[in-house]
Every structure is written in C-alpha cells, then in structure tokens.
Amino acid sequence: MSILEQIQGGADLRRFSLRELEQLCQEIRWEILRVVARNGGHLSSNLGAVELTVALHYVYDLPRDKLLFDVGHQCYAHKLLTGRLHEFPTLRRAGGLSGFPRRQESESDAFGAGHSGTAVSAALGFARAARLLGEDYHCVALVGDGAFMDGPNVEALNDAGRSELPLVVVLNDNTMSISKNVGALSEYLNRLRSNRGYWRFKSRTAGFLKRIPGVGPALHDAVYSVKNAVKSLLVHGQFFENLGFTYLGPIDGHNLSLLIRNLTRAKNLGRPVLVHAVTQKGYGYKPAEEKPDKYHGVAPYFVEREAAPAPGFDACAGQTLLEMAAEDPAVCVITAAMRDGTGVARFAEAHPDRFFDVGIAEEHAVTLAAGLAAGGAKPFFAVYSTFLQRGYDQIVHDVALQNLHAVFLIGHAGLVGEDGATHQGAFDLSFLTHVPNLTLLAPSCAQELAMMLRWAKDAPGPVAIRYPKAESAAAHNIVPLQKGDWQVVSVAHRAQAVVFAVGSMVGPAMMAADTLALEGLEVEVVNCRKVKPLPDRMLEKYARLPIVTLEENAVLGGFGAQVAVRCAQLGLGARVLPLGIPDAFIPHGTRAQQLAGCGLDVEGICRTLRRLLGADNPKDALEVGRD
C-alpha cells in the first residue's frame, strides 16, 4: 500500500518520517500527472505546491483549522490529502470532483474559490468570526504571487495587519501567474527572493551561532527574533512589516523540513504572519518546469483528435488586432494577466509599446482603457466574461457614463466546460444590456468576429463583443454589419415560428431548423448579432409569430428578457419564449453536457419548438406541418 493510500488527513501525516513524507510528495505528483493527463486541468501550479500543501496539512489540524486557497489552482494535493483519493479520477468530470475548492464537496474546503483576491479577506473573516463566537482555531490563506498583486488581497492585508488576530498568509511565490507577473509589487518580490547577500548572511550566521557550545541554540533563537532589524539593512523595503505582519522568508518551498519549521513558528506567534515560500511551477515534471505557462491549464493529452480543431475565436481576435494595429497606430491592447488565454500574445510581441498587461487587476484595466480612450487612443481590453464582472462599476462610471470609445473583447462567454461554476460566462449579457451608451455585439463565427472588430475600431462610444470558449462554427454568408443589425440565416417560406439566436446559438438554431423542416415544421432563424440596441424594425416584422430567443447567458435579465420588454413597450403583443441558462450555477462537465443540461443543444431546441407548435414528437410535427 502506498503512503498516499494511508492518508485521510493531517493526523495521518504526522505518523510518518520526513523521508516518508518526501516519498508521499512524489506519489502525489504522479497521481496528479496521471489524472490531469486524462481529464485536463491545472498542472504546473499544482505540481509546484505539493510540498507546501503537505507541510500545511502536517502543521495545521484540518478541518478544525481553516485553510483557504486564493483562486484554487493549487488545490489538487489538498484534495488528495483529505480523503478524496478514490474520487480523484473524476476530477473536472460531470458529477465528479471540482477543479477548485468547493464547500459542498468537503468540510476541509473551508471556502470556495475560482477567482483571485478572495483568500485573505475570507480568512480574516473566519478569524474575526472565531473571536466573536469564542472559538479557537487557526486561519491560513494560501496565495500565489500572481493573485497576491490583486487589489482585494492588498486591501485585506492592510486591514488584517492591524487586527492582531492569529492569521497566517502563505505567499506561494513561483514567479509566474498565468501570464508573467507585472508591476511594482512583483518587482519587490523579485528583490526579496533574489537577495543573495541576505541569504548568505542568514545561513552563515545561523550556522555559527548553533555551533557555540552550550548556549548556541538559545542564542540562535534570540538573534532570530530580531532578524527583521538585520533584514532591513539588506533587503530594501519592509512592505509586509509596515502593514503589520511578521515576515518569515523567503524560504525554499520544496524543502519540507524548512516549511514545517517556519509554518509551526508562524502558527505559534498568534498574530498576523506572512510566510514567503519560493517554489517552482511544474516542479518534479521536466516539461512543466521548462514551460510552466504551457502547462498551466491543459486539455487531456492522452486523447487523439480525429481532425484539427477549427480556428478559435481568441486566435481570430488576436490576428485581427495585429492587422488593425499595422493600419492604425492608435490601436492598443490591454489584458489582465491573460495574454495567452485571450489570444493576444502575438500582439504583445509585435507591439510591446502598445500592449499593457496590468496583472490581475480588471478594475484598473477598465479605467485604464477609459483614460486611453479619453486621450485619443483606441483601446481593446481582452478579458474573460467571468473576470469582467470584477470591473462592472468602472464600465458604468468610467467608460459608459462618459461615452468613451473603449472596446471590450469578452472571451469565454457562456458555458466553459470543465472549469465549472466559478468560470461560467453566464451573466455578461444581463449586466451589459442595461448600460446606457454601450453597443453589444455577439458573433456567430470567427469571420463575423473579425468583421465586428474592424467595425468597432471606429464606432462611436463603448463597444462590447462577446464570444464563446468553443471552436468557431462554420462561416455562413455574412452580411456586413453596416448593412443590417440582424441577419436572417435560415429562411422559412411559411414560417410557423422564429428563433432569435445570439452568437454561439446561431449554429445550433440553424441545425434545429433543418431537423424540424424534415418533420414539416418551418422555423425561421435570425442571427441577432447586435444585442444592444435592439432593432425595432425586426421586432415589428416578426411580432405575429411565436418568438423563441436563444442565448448562452442567464435567462433572467438576458437577451430574451430585453426582447420581451421591448416588444411590450412597442405594443406588439408578441409571444416571446426566452431560452438560456437557468437560474442556477452550472457545475463542471463538458461543454456539450452543460448545453444539453440547459436545453441549449440541437435536440433541446427542437424539443422546445415542437412543444411550442403543438407537436411533442417528430410524428406529431409532421401532422402539424400539414395543417
């Protein structure tokens, strides 16, 4: 039996020797590699955090003590150490383990995560709750150096440092978030981790003191307690101490002995402590060590594809931006630590002077875009839908209120598959359609996206373009945007209903119309590529027919709701049936499974239209079609 198979929690860890714990770390790595190879997932970050996670579980008593992950990209070892080994092969699969911490999954998952900037605030909340309720437990926030730059984490550090509560923040410093870290805080950490003079001084002094007969260990501890005074002479700036934290580090994040010793000391201090551990992303797996960014989030890589994938929306956006930049020197691009994921890495290489990676700081990114626009530039902010939520106030107050020409490229809109509930792009249509001055577009294919980008470059006011994580659908005969807000893409000569489809739903709607046509039901499909403002002329044209709206967005407050409201305002008396994502957080699974579960796959759309037209099955549909 392996050591890992004997572990159900921290108490089990404490039965093993240091050498056995090091063996356990290797077993954990191989299990992570085995499962991620088949299921996909976050590989590099998890491989780099194994020793750190084992040490945390060794020192702290979970679930009584609270361990909180920021983002949660590093939680796989934690799951394996808390009784989920036999479920681990279900990672990121429908009905299986989530790829992120999830309170509903285990009592050892103290707080759910998926976005950055949450762990320190929530851990401080736990610590204050413990004091209020007279409970006695320890709180630890594990934060990566990329997420550490996020504004809410800095705000929480500022609050926590003066609290005098027993809160430990562990900085997992692997020198890399999804994209290269940027900014002054990142440079500060670089100085801390690379100050060889401090490391040499500390090592030599400790060795000398411990060798003094009789009093060596005690003298070492006494000197160690005043090390901050020495450190301040050798390391420029005392950012964490100035915030009120006791700073321990930097320490080797792959040395179990050092980790256990420092975490134990932090635990016993009983006040705010920051433990700075330097780790290597992908540690223990050479390909991931050499290219950690490529192994950050990976698809299953033991699966053979039958054909090459179609061009993606992100790649199309990046290529079109490159072409526009060659034509217009005012074009510039902003991203929030996601240059690869949003498809703009090539733009960054070609135009470093016109590319701004602000780190994990979406709020700042939006207002930066506003300032660039006010100054005469043409900014494009490439961001995932789920992360744009963080900049909502800035969209309203800084961009739309001033009617500034900033363009938001909203990728991963709709259902995103295995990353699950925390990463679904289910709300952008709802929170953007009611913002005045803003034009909202949704392409049905990559070619339409390219056309929209070129149109948006010189359009008045703010523009948002949302597109899915999915591969691009095949192009249809696209009419230029200037010649029509909406485009009829599937014509029915004696239409019995019309489908207003948005973006990624256009392809499935057309396939559903083809299927129903074989059953004698005639349904017209409209590509509603301009979601806001709505074209009254098209609403008036189709008001006599039953209208089904299709969107990969929350049905509450989404496109369908806007269509129903506008039809009512125009007094059209239209019958509108909105279809979209239900009022629920959609769990992880494949994108196809999620679409089917929401009734947004071809069969689900056909089923809804048959029911609407009084034909509950294909046989009934043939009878209705003859009427």
Spans of features found by a protein language model:
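Structural signature of the thiamine diphosphate
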Residues: 219-287, 405-410, 429-478, 602-627
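Glycine-/acidic-rich phosphate or pyrophosphate-binding loops and their flanking alpha/beta elements
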Residues: 261-264, 296, 312-327, 343-349, ...
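Peripheral docking tails and interdomain loops at the edges
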Residues: 301-303, 309, 417-419, 439, ...
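Cofactor-binding active-site loop characterized by glycine-rich and histidine/acidic residues
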Residues: 42-163, 331, 335-336, 344-345
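N-terminal amphipathic, basic-rich helices that act as targeting or association modules
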Residues: 1-82, 239-261, 269, 273-277
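A glycine-rich helix N-cap at a beta->alpha junction
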Residues: 87-97, 162-176, 197-200, 400-412
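Long, well-ordered, tryptophan-enriched scaffold segments
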Residues: 175-317
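Non-catalytic terminal/interface segments that mediate subunit docking, oligomerization
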Residues: 65-66, 271, 279-389, 394-403, ...
